[in-house]
């Protein structure tokens, strides 16, 4: 019935109906979808809600993003002060507007607006247009539309986020921090009342100015709250005693470089981060302490990143030390690519274990090495001859690492680094060559900590599920509290390395007595059980340290952001002390559980660390299951001895029935030369029995020049340069490689033409030449310049 009458009315009054529809449509669309298009400050908070830092909005205003809610005290104060009928009207208050009209007419100017909080939101939206009756009419229309769209609490939220609070402070949240150093929900009644009266006259807040006027307005509001029985008398009297803010608080700068990162990725947003305020401030203190120490050596920049392994959340993010602009304080070193030094060595060790190329204790050569003109050196410029792979990693020896990479291949290792998502390893493998393992590449602290967190997470998940891996174990690190990392489903296949290989790598990295002879280990706390590694780039430009246990990864970089190197800047002396100080502020963690399902017990040669043969003294060891692909011991050989076992013999000089066959651990000549000096229990091959060596040594190799006890006088050429003496040796197999020594100094090796130039100071020397079978000849000479 009603619809029929309405239809008849529409047909009779088409013009009125059309105008009405147009007005309704205009009214409906009178407010834009986004009411405020202002730029907001980028804000970061700790996981506890503590303000860590903020970056001012593009228009120069401290305007925080809108909050989800308005605290009770401020809500009560602002309603009592500005619009006590707020919850009763529908956008405007006719009575207040009428009283305002009378006052303005009497004063012959605008002295009172009579606006509700809803109208004030509209006025803020319209950027405070000049006051007029027409403008007031527009505000009323839009205010009613606003009430249709939003709830009362949402309207209060808009007001609290956009109201001016003096100077360039906009919004309750920023005002709360700026004037009281508190979050809005932490405000007292007096503080909330102070902020409630400010938007009415924002110029009142200036340090040392207008304090009495502001105090009077605040106290009147507090009295009203007491009279309205919102607060009791005791609360009212105590609130009156609270002083006004005098000096504005500075915006905290607790994580300035994470703020930079957030501003790039979440500009104009308020991000609740995963940072722990306690740990962030403690790490800041540690960095400041070491910065004050290191700057005396003109080392100005330090970065520390701490990751929770279980969640991959960032716990602490210190992108640089508290230096100045002259020393690049704004550079976020956590994201900056830097030379790796030795920090990638554990990845090579894990890769070779996982492929079965080595076992943890496999001997790796540590001898003078030259490969296509590339001559790596150990940090201490010494050689051990041969070192177990795990000790080579623990001591960060360079020569064994290069030889391991040569065996594994640069291309394969490059692929592994790509699998680890080290973004700065981005040139062709051939551009790196063998230097890839010694600092020829670059990485950053973020990617490095991500890789080590992946390793720890792999072992943790495998041991907790007995034999499973997560497909997204190498998940990116996360600093957003409202986001969680998705590790994907569990599967049987590994991502990059098996858990057993990673666990064995951590076992090697757990060693504490490295590098040998270094006096910097007084800071080391042996009760902190972590796997860790240091690295130092060429020229002392970068000092790295990374540590990992079941729960945390800590990464440290020390150096100059400009790339300037400094003497004494090393990973072990500069970065490692910071690493351990940071670990001390976290709870102690148990060591990784052993992933027995990815290990097997096999017989290992006691001497060489390779799979034992029937000629080796063996012992049972837990190794990765891939060990079955590893090499058998290449160093044990059967030799023939006489009955006393003091001399070697052969069939030309000893009856077969009198020979004793024994197994002997024999290293190649150069390896043996250095190994026996470091290992006093190493037994060299016994000498040949008299009458046997002529059939062996002298038939195979002898000196051509010089003869025994020759006195050699070094001469000079026409340019005044000393001419070397050429030592010559003949060998029955010209393709045999010979290794030359002058006393204990290794000179090099020769093939085909066995000639070695020598220049030395005046004195008596022993020349030693050893072939590939370990047969050696010696000659004493005297040199005179």
Language-model features, listed with the residues they occupy:
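Juxtamembrane regions of bacterial inner-membrane/periplasmic proteins
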Residues: 2-297, 309, 313-315, 320, ...
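Soluble, non-transmembrane domains of envelope/secretory-pathway proteins that act on or interact
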Residues: 11-14, 484-490, 529-785
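Residue-level preference for non-acidic, small/hydrophobic
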Residues: 49, 78, 121, 155, ...
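Short pre-catalytic segments that frame enzyme active sites
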Residues: 50-64, 174, 203-207, 259-267, ...
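Surface-exposed patches in mature extracellular/periplasmic domains of secreted proteins
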Residues: 86-95, 110, 133-134, 156, ...
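Conserved catalytic neighborhood of penicillin-recognizing serine enzymes
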Residues: 106-131, 185, 248-264, 358-413, ...
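Glycine-rich, acidic and aromatic/proline-enriched surface loops and short helix-turn segments
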Residues: 123, 127, 161-168, 185, ...
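A penicillin-recognizing enzyme superfamily signal
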Residues: 273-294, 304-308, 317, 324-336, ...
């Amino acid at each position: 019935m009603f619809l029929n009458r309405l239809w008849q009315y529409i047909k009779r009054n088409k013009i009125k109906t059309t105008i009405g529809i147009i007005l309704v449509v205009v009214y409906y669309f009178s407010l834009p979808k986004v009411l405020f298009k202002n730029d907001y400050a980028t804000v970061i908070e700790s996981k506890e809600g503590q303000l860590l830092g903020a970056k001012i909005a593009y228009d120069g205003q401290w305007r925080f993003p809108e909050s989800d809610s308005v605290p009770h005290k401020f809500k009560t104060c602002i309603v009592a002060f500005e619009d006590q009928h707020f919850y009763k009207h529908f956008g405007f208050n006719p009575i207040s507007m009428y009283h305002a009209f009378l006052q303005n007419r009497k004063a012959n100017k605008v002295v009172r607006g009579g606006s509700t909080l809803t109208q004030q939101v509209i006025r803020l939206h319209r950027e405070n247009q000049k006051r007029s009756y027409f403008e007031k009419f527009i505000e009323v229309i839009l205010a009613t539309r606003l009430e249709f769209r939003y709830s009362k609490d949402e309207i209060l939220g808009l007001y609290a986020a956009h109201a001016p609070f003096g100077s360039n402070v906009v919004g309750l949240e920023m005002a709360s921090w700026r004037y009281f150093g508190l979050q809005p929900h932490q405000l007292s009644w007096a503080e909330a009342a102070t902020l409630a009266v400010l938007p009415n006259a924002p110029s009142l807040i200036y340090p040392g100015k207008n304090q009495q006027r502001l105090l009077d307005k605040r106290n009147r509001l507090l009295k009203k709250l007491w009279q309205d029985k919102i607060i009791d008398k005791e609360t009212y009297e105590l609130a009156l005693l609270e002083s006004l803010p005098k000096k504005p608080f500075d915006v905290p700068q607790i994580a300035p470089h994470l703020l930079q990162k957030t501003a790039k990725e979440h500009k104009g947003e308020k991000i609740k981060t995963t940072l722990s305020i306690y740990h962030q401030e403690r790490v800041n203190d540690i960095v400041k302490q070491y910065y004050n120490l290191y700057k005396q050596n003109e080392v100005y920049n330090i970065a520390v990143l701490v990751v929770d392994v279980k969640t991959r959340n960032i716990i602490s993010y210190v992108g640089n030390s508290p230096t100045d602009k002259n020393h690049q304080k704004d550079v976020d070193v956590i994201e900056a690519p830097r030379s790796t030094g030795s920090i990638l060595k554990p990845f090579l060790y894990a890769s070779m274990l996982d492929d079965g190329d080595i076992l943890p204790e496999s001997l790796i050569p540590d001898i003078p090495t030259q490969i296509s003109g590339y001559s790596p050196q150990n940090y201490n410029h010494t050689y051990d001859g041969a070192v177990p792979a795990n000790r080579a990693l623990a001591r960060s020896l360079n020569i064994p690492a290069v030889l391991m990479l040569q065996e594994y291949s640069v291309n394969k290792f490059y692929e592994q680094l790509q699998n680890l998502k080290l973004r700065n390893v981005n040139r062709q493998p051939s551009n790196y060559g063998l230097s890839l393992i010694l600092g020829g590449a670059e990485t950053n602290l973020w990617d490095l900590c991500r890789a080590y967190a992946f390793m720890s997470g792999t072992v943790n998940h495998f041991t907790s599920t007995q034999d499973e891996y997560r497909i997204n174990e190498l998940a990116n690190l996360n600093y957003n509290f409202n986001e969680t990392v998705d590790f994907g489903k569990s599967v049987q296949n590994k991502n990059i390395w098996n858990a057993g290989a990673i666990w064995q790598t951590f076992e090697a990295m757990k060693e504490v007595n490295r590098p040998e002879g270094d006096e910097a280990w007084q800071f080391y706390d042996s009760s902190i059980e972590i796997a860790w590694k240091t690295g130092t780039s060429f020229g002392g430009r970068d000092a790295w340290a990374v540590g990992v246990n079941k729960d945390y990864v800590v990464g440290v970089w020390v150096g100059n952001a400009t790339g300037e190197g400094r003497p004494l800047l090393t990973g072990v002396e500069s970065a490692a002390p910071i690493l351990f100080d940071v670990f001390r502020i976290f709870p102690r963690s148990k060591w990784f559980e052993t992933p027995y399902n990815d290990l097997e017990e096999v017989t290992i040669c006691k001497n060489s660390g390779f799979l034992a043969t029937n000629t080796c003294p063996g012992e049972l060891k837990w190794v990765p299951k891939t060990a079955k692909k590893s090499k058998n011991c290449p160093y044990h050989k059967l030799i023939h001895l006489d009955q006393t076992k003091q001399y070697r013999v052969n069939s030309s000089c000893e009856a077969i029935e009198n020979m004793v066959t024994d197994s002997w651990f024999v290293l190649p000549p150069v390896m043996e030369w250095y190994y026996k000096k470091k290992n006093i229990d190493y037994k060299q091959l016994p000498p040949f029995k008299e009458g046997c060596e002529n059939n062996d040594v002298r038939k195979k190799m002898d000196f051509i020049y010089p003869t025994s006890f020759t006195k050699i006088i070094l001469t000079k050429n026409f340019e005044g340069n000393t001419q070397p003496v050429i030592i010559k040796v003949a060998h029955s197999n010209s393709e045999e490689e010979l290794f030359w020594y002058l006393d204990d100094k290794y000179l090099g090796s020769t093939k085909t033409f066995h000639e070695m130039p020598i220049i030395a100071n005046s004195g008596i020397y022993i020349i030693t030449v050893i072939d590939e079978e370990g047969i050696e000849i010696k000659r004493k000479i005297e040199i005179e310049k």
